[in-house]
Protein backbone atom coordinates (compact mmCIF):
# COMPACT_ATOMS: atom_id res chain seq x y z
CA UNK A 1 0.00 0.00 0.00
CA UNK A 2 1.15 3.53 -0.66
CA UNK A 3 0.93 4.50 2.97
CA UNK A 4 3.11 1.54 3.96
CA UNK A 5 5.75 2.69 1.47
CA UNK A 6 5.63 6.17 2.87
CA UNK A 7 6.08 4.79 6.37
CA UNK A 8 9.08 2.71 5.34
CA UNK A 9 10.58 5.79 3.75
CA UNK A 10 10.85 7.30 7.22
CA UNK A 11 12.01 4.10 8.91
CA UNK A 12 8.84 3.65 10.95
CA UNK A 13 7.91 0.52 12.84
CA UNK A 14 4.40 -0.82 13.33
CA UNK A 15 1.09 0.90 12.74
CA UNK A 16 -0.08 4.29 13.90
CA UNK A 17 -3.77 4.65 14.44
CA UNK A 18 -5.65 6.07 17.38
CA UNK A 19 -4.20 5.34 20.82
CA UNK A 20 -1.50 2.79 19.95
CA UNK A 21 1.97 2.06 21.29
CA UNK A 22 3.59 5.09 19.75
CA UNK A 23 1.16 7.75 20.90
CA UNK A 24 2.45 10.51 23.10
CA UNK A 25 0.42 13.24 24.77
CA UNK A 26 1.54 16.85 24.84
CA UNK A 27 0.61 19.38 27.48
CA UNK A 28 -2.49 20.30 25.48
CA UNK A 29 -3.64 16.70 25.32
CA UNK A 30 -3.12 16.41 21.58
CA UNK A 31 -2.25 12.99 20.24
CA UNK A 32 1.09 12.57 18.55
CA UNK A 33 3.33 9.79 17.36
CA UNK A 34 7.05 10.25 17.10
CA UNK A 35 8.70 8.72 14.05
CA UNK A 36 12.25 7.64 14.80
CA UNK A 37 14.60 8.70 12.03
CA UNK A 38 17.60 6.96 13.55
CA UNK A 39 17.77 3.32 12.46
CA UNK A 40 19.43 2.29 15.69
CA UNK A 41 16.19 2.85 17.57
CA UNK A 42 14.22 0.37 15.51
CA UNK A 43 15.66 -2.70 17.27
CA UNK A 44 14.54 -1.42 20.65
CA UNK A 45 11.15 -0.46 19.31
CA UNK A 46 10.62 -4.00 18.01
CA UNK A 47 11.54 -5.49 21.39
CA UNK A 48 9.13 -3.10 23.08
CA UNK A 49 6.35 -4.12 20.72
CA UNK A 50 6.88 -7.82 21.46
CA UNK A 51 6.79 -7.23 25.22
CA UNK A 52 3.68 -5.11 25.07
CA UNK A 53 1.90 -7.64 22.83
CA UNK A 54 2.64 -10.43 25.33
CA UNK A 55 1.29 -8.33 28.17
CA UNK A 56 -1.76 -7.34 26.13
CA UNK A 57 -2.54 -11.00 25.33
CA UNK A 58 -2.37 -11.98 28.97
CA UNK A 59 -4.65 -9.13 29.99
CA UNK A 60 -7.21 -9.53 27.21
CA UNK A 61 -9.90 -11.26 29.29
CA UNK A 62 -9.47 -8.79 32.11
CA UNK A 63 -9.90 -5.84 29.74
CA UNK A 64 -13.00 -7.43 28.16
CA UNK A 65 -14.58 -7.66 31.59
CA UNK A 66 -13.78 -4.03 32.28
CA UNK A 67 -15.29 -2.95 28.97
CA UNK A 68 -18.46 -5.03 29.25
CA UNK A 69 -18.88 -4.57 33.00
CA UNK A 70 -21.57 -6.15 35.13
CA UNK A 71 -23.80 -6.95 32.15
CA UNK A 72 -21.23 -9.33 30.72
CA UNK A 73 -20.49 -10.95 34.09
CA UNK A 74 -24.20 -11.50 34.64
CA UNK A 75 -24.59 -12.93 31.16
CA UNK A 76 -21.63 -15.26 31.68
CA UNK A 77 -23.06 -16.51 34.96
CA UNK A 78 -26.48 -17.14 33.39
CA UNK A 79 -24.91 -19.04 30.52
CA UNK A 80 -22.89 -21.17 32.93
CA UNK A 81 -25.99 -22.02 35.00
CA UNK A 82 -27.90 -22.95 31.85
CA UNK A 83 -25.13 -25.27 30.68
CA UNK A 84 -24.93 -26.90 34.09
CA UNK A 85 -28.69 -27.52 34.26
CA UNK A 86 -28.72 -29.13 30.82
CA UNK A 87 -25.78 -31.36 31.62
CA UNK A 88 -23.55 -29.68 29.07
CA UNK A 89 -19.93 -28.94 29.72
CA UNK A 90 -19.52 -25.30 30.59
CA UNK A 91 -17.84 -23.17 27.93
CA UNK A 92 -14.44 -21.75 28.71
CA UNK A 93 -15.89 -18.38 27.65
CA UNK A 94 -19.60 -18.54 28.52
CA UNK A 95 -19.95 -14.80 27.85
CA UNK A 96 -19.07 -15.33 24.21
CA UNK A 97 -22.67 -16.18 23.24
CA UNK A 98 -24.19 -13.78 25.72
CA UNK A 99 -22.18 -10.90 24.32
CA UNK A 100 -24.13 -11.22 21.08
CA UNK A 101 -27.25 -10.09 22.92
CA UNK A 102 -25.39 -7.09 24.31
CA UNK A 103 -24.53 -5.80 20.89
CA UNK A 104 -27.52 -6.86 18.85
CA UNK A 105 -28.93 -4.99 15.91
CA UNK A 106 -31.21 -2.81 17.98
CA UNK A 107 -28.37 -1.65 20.22
CA UNK A 108 -26.28 -0.80 17.17
CA UNK A 109 -29.23 0.93 15.57
CA UNK A 110 -29.93 3.05 18.64
CA UNK A 111 -26.29 4.12 18.71
CA UNK A 112 -26.62 5.30 15.10
CA UNK A 113 -29.85 7.10 15.98
CA UNK A 114 -28.22 8.86 18.92
CA UNK A 115 -25.38 10.02 16.68
CA UNK A 116 -27.82 11.36 14.07
CA UNK A 117 -29.84 13.18 16.73
CA UNK A 118 -26.71 14.69 18.29
CA UNK A 119 -25.88 16.18 14.88
CA UNK A 120 -29.41 17.47 14.27
CA UNK A 121 -30.27 14.97 11.53
CA UNK A 122 -33.68 14.12 12.95
CA UNK A 123 -35.17 12.87 9.68
CA UNK A 124 -32.31 10.40 9.32
CA UNK A 125 -32.87 9.23 12.89
CA UNK A 126 -36.56 8.58 12.20
CA UNK A 127 -35.70 6.70 9.00
CA UNK A 128 -33.33 4.46 10.94
CA UNK A 129 -35.95 3.70 13.57
CA UNK A 130 -38.52 2.87 10.89
CA UNK A 131 -36.13 0.58 9.03
CA UNK A 132 -35.81 -3.18 9.08
CA UNK A 133 -32.94 -3.20 11.54
CA UNK A 134 -35.12 -2.25 14.49
CA UNK A 135 -36.90 -4.62 16.84
CA UNK A 136 -40.37 -3.10 16.69
CA UNK A 137 -41.28 -4.78 19.98
CA UNK A 138 -38.43 -3.09 21.82
CA UNK A 139 -40.00 -0.30 23.93
CA UNK A 140 -36.92 1.83 23.39
CA UNK A 141 -37.90 2.33 19.75
CA UNK A 142 -41.21 3.98 20.54
CA UNK A 143 -39.63 6.00 23.33
CA UNK A 144 -36.89 7.26 21.03
CA UNK A 145 -39.41 8.22 18.32
CA UNK A 146 -41.45 10.13 20.87
CA UNK A 147 -38.38 11.99 22.11
CA UNK A 148 -37.37 12.97 18.58
CA UNK A 149 -40.82 14.29 17.70
CA UNK A 150 -40.83 16.35 20.89
CA UNK A 151 -37.45 17.89 20.03
CA UNK A 152 -38.49 18.66 16.44
CA UNK A 153 -41.34 20.82 17.71
CA UNK A 154 -38.86 23.11 19.46
CA UNK A 155 -36.47 23.65 16.54
CA UNK A 156 -35.76 27.13 15.23
CA UNK A 157 -35.08 27.87 11.55
CA UNK A 158 -31.80 29.69 10.93
CA UNK A 159 -31.76 32.84 8.81
CA UNK A 160 -29.14 31.93 6.19
CA UNK A 161 -28.53 35.63 5.50
CA UNK A 162 -27.25 36.10 9.06
CA UNK A 163 -24.83 33.15 9.14
CA UNK A 164 -21.21 34.07 9.79
CA UNK A 165 -18.23 32.48 8.02
CA UNK A 166 -14.80 32.33 9.69
CA UNK A 167 -11.54 31.30 8.07
CA UNK A 168 -7.94 30.45 8.88
CA UNK A 169 -4.67 29.74 7.13
CA UNK A 170 -2.27 26.91 8.03
CA UNK A 171 -1.97 26.79 11.82
CA UNK A 172 1.27 27.55 13.65
CA UNK A 173 2.73 24.85 15.88
CA UNK A 174 6.03 26.53 16.82
CA UNK A 175 5.74 30.36 16.92
CA UNK A 176 9.44 30.64 17.69
CA UNK A 177 10.22 29.42 14.18
CA UNK A 178 7.28 31.13 12.48
CA UNK A 179 7.03 34.66 13.83
CA UNK A 180 10.59 35.75 13.08
CA UNK A 181 11.70 39.37 12.87
CA UNK A 182 11.73 39.25 9.07
CA UNK A 183 9.32 40.41 6.39
CA UNK A 184 8.07 36.84 6.00
CA UNK A 185 7.83 36.29 9.75
CA UNK A 186 5.82 39.47 10.19
CA UNK A 187 3.53 38.36 7.39
CA UNK A 188 2.97 35.03 9.14
CA UNK A 189 2.22 36.85 12.39
CA UNK A 190 -0.40 38.88 10.57
CA UNK A 191 -2.31 36.19 8.67
CA UNK A 192 -1.84 33.01 10.70
CA UNK A 193 -3.39 31.51 13.83
CA UNK A 194 -1.58 29.34 16.37
CA UNK A 195 -2.74 25.88 17.38
CA UNK A 196 -3.70 26.97 20.95
CA UNK A 197 -5.65 29.92 19.56
CA UNK A 198 -7.57 27.67 17.19
CA UNK A 199 -8.35 25.17 19.94
CA UNK A 200 -9.57 27.98 22.21
CA UNK A 201 -11.73 29.40 19.41
CA UNK A 202 -13.41 26.01 18.88
CA UNK A 203 -14.07 25.61 22.60
CA UNK A 204 -15.50 29.08 23.09
CA UNK A 205 -17.69 28.99 20.00
CA UNK A 206 -19.03 25.61 21.09
CA UNK A 207 -19.78 26.98 24.54
CA UNK A 208 -21.66 29.87 22.94
CA UNK A 209 -23.90 27.54 20.96
CA UNK A 210 -22.32 27.75 17.52
CA UNK A 211 -22.89 24.81 15.17
CA UNK A 212 -20.70 24.17 12.13
CA UNK A 213 -22.61 23.84 8.84
CA UNK A 214 -21.50 23.40 5.23
CA UNK A 215 -21.94 26.16 2.69
CA UNK A 216 -24.15 23.80 0.68
CA UNK A 217 -26.48 23.63 3.69
CA UNK A 218 -27.32 27.32 3.19
CA UNK A 219 -28.82 27.16 -0.29
CA UNK A 220 -28.98 25.13 -3.48
CA UNK A 221 -30.10 25.59 -7.06
CA UNK A 222 -33.62 24.29 -7.62
CA UNK A 223 -36.66 25.14 -9.71
CA UNK A 224 -38.90 27.95 -8.53
CA UNK A 225 -42.65 28.23 -9.03
CA UNK A 226 -42.17 29.24 -12.68
CA UNK A 227 -39.85 26.34 -13.48
CA UNK A 228 -36.75 28.55 -13.53
CA UNK A 229 -33.61 27.29 -11.78
CA UNK A 230 -32.68 29.62 -8.94
CA UNK A 231 -30.39 29.55 -5.92
CA UNK A 232 -32.88 29.04 -3.11
CA UNK A 233 -32.40 29.06 0.65
CA UNK A 234 -32.53 25.73 2.46
CA UNK A 235 -33.90 25.09 5.93
CA UNK A 236 -31.42 24.65 8.75
CA UNK A 237 -33.33 23.70 11.90
CA UNK A 238 -31.50 23.86 15.23
CA UNK A 239 -32.52 23.83 18.90
CA UNK A 240 -33.13 27.20 20.58
CA UNK A 241 -29.90 29.04 21.38
CA UNK A 242 -27.88 27.36 18.63
CA UNK A 243 -26.29 29.45 15.87
CA UNK A 244 -25.04 28.17 12.51
CA UNK A 245 -21.66 29.18 11.09
CA UNK A 246 -19.37 28.17 8.21
CA UNK A 247 -15.62 27.53 8.45
CA UNK A 248 -12.91 27.44 5.79
CA UNK A 249 -9.13 27.20 5.59
CA UNK A 250 -7.07 28.86 2.87
CA UNK A 251 -3.95 27.58 1.11
CA UNK A 252 -4.10 23.98 2.33
CA UNK A 253 -1.15 23.29 0.05
CA UNK A 254 1.78 23.42 2.48
CA UNK A 255 3.88 25.54 0.15
CA UNK A 256 7.55 24.88 -0.40
CA UNK A 257 8.51 28.26 1.05
CA UNK A 258 6.89 27.26 4.37
CA UNK A 259 9.21 24.29 4.91
CA UNK A 260 10.88 24.58 8.31
CA UNK A 261 8.66 27.45 9.43
CA UNK A 262 7.09 25.71 12.43
CA UNK A 263 3.94 24.45 10.69
CA UNK A 264 2.67 21.11 9.41
CA UNK A 265 4.00 20.12 6.02
CA UNK A 266 1.39 17.70 4.66
CA UNK A 267 -1.81 15.77 5.38
CA UNK A 268 -1.82 11.97 5.22
CA UNK A 269 -4.02 9.09 6.30
CA UNK A 270 -3.25 6.98 9.34
CA UNK A 271 -3.78 3.22 9.42
CA UNK A 272 -7.46 3.72 10.24
CA UNK A 273 -7.93 5.96 7.22
CA UNK A 274 -8.18 9.10 9.35
CA UNK A 275 -6.45 12.34 8.26
CA UNK A 276 -3.45 13.43 10.32
CA UNK A 277 -0.58 15.84 9.69
CA UNK A 278 3.14 15.44 9.30
CA UNK A 279 5.37 17.92 11.11
CA UNK A 280 9.14 18.26 11.37
CA UNK A 281 10.49 19.87 14.51
CA UNK A 282 13.60 22.01 14.87
CA UNK A 283 15.79 18.95 15.43
CA UNK A 284 14.67 17.30 12.19
CA UNK A 285 12.47 14.73 13.92
CA UNK A 286 9.27 13.94 12.03
CA UNK A 287 6.04 13.70 13.99
CA UNK A 288 2.58 12.55 12.99
CA UNK A 289 -0.40 14.06 14.80
CA UNK A 290 -2.72 17.01 15.25
CA UNK A 291 -0.65 19.83 13.80
CA UNK A 292 -3.24 21.60 11.68
CA UNK A 293 -6.93 22.35 11.38
CA UNK A 294 -8.22 19.06 9.96
CA UNK A 295 -7.16 16.57 12.66
CA UNK A 296 -7.79 19.08 15.45
CA UNK A 297 -11.31 19.78 14.19
CA UNK A 298 -11.93 16.05 13.71
CA UNK A 299 -11.00 15.32 17.30
CA UNK A 300 -13.14 18.19 18.59
CA UNK A 301 -16.21 17.01 16.66
CA UNK A 302 -15.63 13.45 17.82
CA UNK A 303 -15.68 14.70 21.41
CA UNK A 304 -18.53 17.16 20.76
CA UNK A 305 -20.69 15.73 17.94
CA UNK A 306 -23.30 18.46 18.49
CA UNK A 307 -20.76 21.01 17.23
CA UNK A 308 -21.36 19.75 13.68
CA UNK A 309 -24.58 19.87 11.66
CA UNK A 310 -25.01 16.46 10.03
CA UNK A 311 -21.26 15.85 10.05
CA UNK A 312 -20.23 19.11 8.35
CA UNK A 313 -16.59 20.17 8.68
CA UNK A 314 -14.59 22.95 6.99
CA UNK A 315 -14.04 24.01 3.38
CA UNK A 316 -10.44 23.46 2.28
CA UNK A 317 -9.36 26.07 -0.29
CA UNK A 318 -6.63 24.91 -2.67
CA UNK A 319 -4.32 26.68 -5.08
CA UNK A 320 -2.31 24.57 -7.52
CA UNK A 321 1.12 25.96 -8.32
CA UNK A 322 2.86 23.97 -5.55
CA UNK A 323 0.54 20.99 -5.72
CA UNK A 324 -2.05 20.26 -3.03
CA UNK A 325 -2.14 19.05 0.59
CA UNK A 326 1.66 18.92 0.73
CA UNK A 327 2.22 16.83 -2.42
CA UNK A 328 3.96 18.28 -5.49
CA UNK A 329 1.33 17.16 -7.98
CA UNK A 330 1.33 20.07 -10.42
CA UNK A 331 2.50 19.54 -14.00
CA UNK A 332 5.32 22.02 -13.40
CA UNK A 333 6.99 19.30 -11.28
CA UNK A 334 6.61 16.66 -14.01
CA UNK A 335 9.67 16.31 -16.28
CA UNK A 336 7.48 14.47 -18.81
CA UNK A 337 5.09 17.42 -19.11
CA UNK A 338 5.56 20.11 -21.76
CA UNK A 339 4.76 22.57 -18.96
CA UNK A 340 7.53 21.31 -16.68
CA UNK A 341 9.34 24.19 -14.98
CA UNK A 342 13.10 23.52 -14.80
CA UNK A 343 13.29 25.89 -11.84
CA UNK A 344 11.20 23.40 -9.85
CA UNK A 345 12.66 20.32 -8.21
CA UNK A 346 11.19 17.45 -10.27
CA UNK A 347 8.94 14.97 -8.52
CA UNK A 348 9.87 11.45 -9.73
CA UNK A 349 6.86 10.00 -7.85
CA UNK A 350 4.30 12.42 -9.24
CA UNK A 351 1.85 9.80 -10.50
CA UNK A 352 2.00 7.94 -7.19
CA UNK A 353 1.44 11.21 -5.34
CA UNK A 354 -1.52 12.10 -7.54
CA UNK A 355 -3.11 8.73 -6.88
CA UNK A 356 -2.53 9.12 -3.15
CA UNK A 357 -4.04 12.62 -3.15
CA UNK A 358 -7.17 11.25 -4.84
CA UNK A 359 -7.43 8.70 -2.05
CA UNK A 360 -6.83 11.44 0.51
CA UNK A 361 -9.41 13.88 -0.86
CA UNK A 362 -12.00 11.09 -1.02
CA UNK A 363 -11.36 10.31 2.65
CA UNK A 364 -11.63 14.00 3.54
CA UNK A 365 -14.92 14.29 1.67
CA UNK A 366 -16.31 11.29 3.54
CA UNK A 367 -15.08 12.94 6.74
CA UNK A 368 -17.29 15.98 6.07
CA UNK A 369 -14.88 18.35 4.34
CA UNK A 370 -15.56 20.30 1.16
CA UNK A 371 -13.10 21.70 -1.36
CA UNK A 372 -12.83 25.11 -3.00
CA UNK A 373 -10.72 26.66 -5.70
CA UNK A 374 -8.39 29.36 -4.41
CA UNK A 375 -7.15 30.00 -7.98
CA UNK A 376 -4.10 28.19 -9.41
CA UNK A 377 -1.46 30.83 -8.76
CA UNK A 378 -3.08 32.75 -5.88
CA UNK A 379 -4.07 35.52 -8.30
CA UNK A 380 -6.13 38.59 -7.51
CA UNK A 381 -9.22 37.86 -9.61
CA UNK A 382 -10.77 41.20 -8.77
CA UNK A 383 -7.87 43.12 -10.34
CA UNK A 384 -6.29 41.03 -13.10
CA UNK A 385 -7.50 41.08 -16.68
CA UNK A 386 -10.17 38.65 -17.81
CA UNK A 387 -7.80 36.69 -20.05
CA UNK A 388 -5.29 36.28 -17.23
CA UNK A 389 -8.03 35.04 -14.92
CA UNK A 390 -9.20 32.55 -17.55
CA UNK A 391 -5.69 31.21 -18.04
CA UNK A 392 -5.20 30.83 -14.29
CA UNK A 393 -8.47 29.05 -13.51
CA UNK A 394 -7.99 26.80 -16.55
CA UNK A 395 -4.69 25.64 -15.04
CA UNK A 396 -6.51 24.92 -11.77
CA UNK A 397 -9.15 22.92 -13.63
CA UNK A 398 -6.41 20.93 -15.36
CA UNK A 399 -4.15 20.26 -12.38
CA UNK A 400 -6.31 20.34 -9.24
CA UNK A 401 -9.89 19.49 -10.18
CA UNK A 402 -8.99 15.92 -11.34
CA UNK A 403 -7.58 15.20 -7.87
CA UNK A 404 -10.90 15.93 -6.14
CA UNK A 405 -13.65 13.35 -5.53
CA UNK A 406 -16.43 15.49 -7.05
CA UNK A 407 -16.83 18.57 -9.26
CA UNK A 408 -15.85 21.73 -7.38
CA UNK A 409 -18.45 24.52 -7.24
CA UNK A 410 -16.94 26.75 -4.51
CA UNK A 411 -14.66 29.69 -5.30
CA UNK A 412 -12.78 31.27 -2.39
CA UNK A 413 -11.16 34.37 -3.82
CA UNK A 414 -7.46 34.93 -3.05
CA UNK A 415 -7.00 38.10 -1.02
CA UNK A 416 -10.79 38.12 -0.66
CA UNK A 417 -10.85 40.02 -3.96
CA UNK A 418 -14.28 39.52 -5.56
CA UNK A 419 -14.99 39.84 -9.29
CA UNK A 420 -17.95 42.08 -8.48
CA UNK A 421 -19.02 44.75 -6.01
CA UNK A 422 -21.76 44.41 -3.39
CA UNK A 423 -24.49 44.29 -6.02
CA UNK A 424 -25.65 40.87 -7.32
CA UNK A 425 -23.70 39.28 -10.16
CA UNK A 426 -25.19 39.76 -13.61
CA UNK A 427 -24.56 38.14 -16.97
CA UNK A 428 -22.77 41.33 -18.01
CA UNK A 429 -19.99 40.43 -15.57
CA UNK A 430 -17.67 38.47 -17.86
CA UNK A 431 -15.48 37.13 -15.08
CA UNK A 432 -18.47 35.79 -13.18
CA UNK A 433 -19.94 34.36 -16.37
CA UNK A 434 -16.74 32.44 -17.11
CA UNK A 435 -16.48 31.05 -13.58
CA UNK A 436 -20.13 30.06 -13.74
CA UNK A 437 -19.50 28.24 -17.03
CA UNK A 438 -16.98 26.06 -15.17
CA UNK A 439 -19.59 25.12 -12.58
CA UNK A 440 -18.81 27.56 -9.76
CA UNK A 441 -21.92 28.63 -7.83
CA UNK A 442 -20.67 29.51 -4.31
CA UNK A 443 -18.37 32.54 -4.06
CA UNK A 444 -16.58 33.81 -0.94
CA UNK A 445 -14.82 37.13 -0.41
CA UNK A 446 -13.56 38.72 2.85
CA UNK A 447 -15.27 41.25 5.10
CA UNK A 448 -14.90 42.10 8.79
CA UNK A 449 -18.65 42.39 9.34
CA UNK A 450 -20.35 39.59 11.31
CA UNK A 451 -22.16 38.33 8.23
CA UNK A 452 -22.95 39.08 4.60
CA UNK A 453 -24.79 36.61 2.38
CA UNK A 454 -26.30 37.28 -1.02
CA UNK A 455 -28.22 34.97 -3.35
CA UNK A 456 -29.45 35.55 -6.86
CA UNK A 457 -29.69 33.73 -10.15
CA UNK A 458 -27.61 30.60 -9.68
CA UNK A 459 -25.10 31.89 -7.15
CA UNK A 460 -24.57 32.37 -3.43
CA UNK A 461 -22.02 34.87 -2.15
CA UNK A 462 -20.77 34.92 1.42
CA UNK A 463 -18.25 37.16 3.14
CA UNK A 464 -15.67 35.58 5.45
CA UNK A 465 -14.05 36.85 8.65
CA UNK A 466 -10.33 36.32 9.23
CA UNK A 467 -9.56 35.00 12.72
CA UNK A 468 -5.83 35.56 12.33
CA UNK A 469 -3.08 37.38 14.20
CA UNK A 470 -4.01 40.79 12.88
CA UNK A 471 -7.72 40.52 13.62
CA UNK A 472 -7.09 39.02 17.07
CA UNK A 473 -4.60 41.79 17.86
CA UNK A 474 -6.97 44.53 16.72
CA UNK A 475 -9.46 43.33 19.34
CA UNK A 476 -6.89 42.38 21.98
CA UNK A 477 -4.54 45.34 21.73
CA UNK A 478 -6.58 48.05 20.02
CA UNK A 479 -10.12 47.54 21.32
CA UNK A 480 -11.70 47.03 17.87
CA UNK A 481 -14.42 44.74 19.28
CA UNK A 482 -15.04 42.90 16.00
CA UNK A 483 -14.95 39.36 17.43
CA UNK A 484 -16.91 39.61 20.69
CA UNK A 485 -19.89 37.78 19.16
CA UNK A 486 -17.63 34.74 18.67
CA UNK A 487 -14.97 34.66 21.37
CA UNK A 488 -13.37 36.40 24.33
CA UNK A 489 -10.19 37.45 22.58
CA UNK A 490 -8.44 38.16 25.91
CA UNK A 491 -8.43 34.43 26.66
CA UNK A 492 -7.66 33.37 23.08
CA UNK A 493 -4.76 35.61 22.07
CA UNK A 494 -1.45 33.71 22.15
CA UNK A 495 1.00 35.66 24.31
CA UNK A 496 3.91 34.16 22.37
CA UNK A 497 3.11 36.46 19.44
CA UNK A 498 5.36 39.46 18.84
CA UNK A 499 3.32 42.63 19.27
CA UNK A 500 2.05 44.89 17.93
CA UNK A 501 0.74 42.85 15.00
CA UNK A 502 0.59 44.90 11.81
CA UNK A 503 -1.15 44.13 8.55
CA UNK A 504 1.19 42.45 6.11
Task: Give residue ranges: language-model regions.
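C-terminal active-site subregion of NodB/CE4 polysaccharide deacetylases
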Residues: 110-111, 117, 123-218, 231-247, ...
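Metal-dependent polysaccharide deacetylase catalytic core of the NodB/CE4 family, i.e.
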Residues: 161-181, 226-229, 238-245, 252-419, ...
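Generic recognition of cysteine residues
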Residues: 17, 46, 51-53, 263, ...
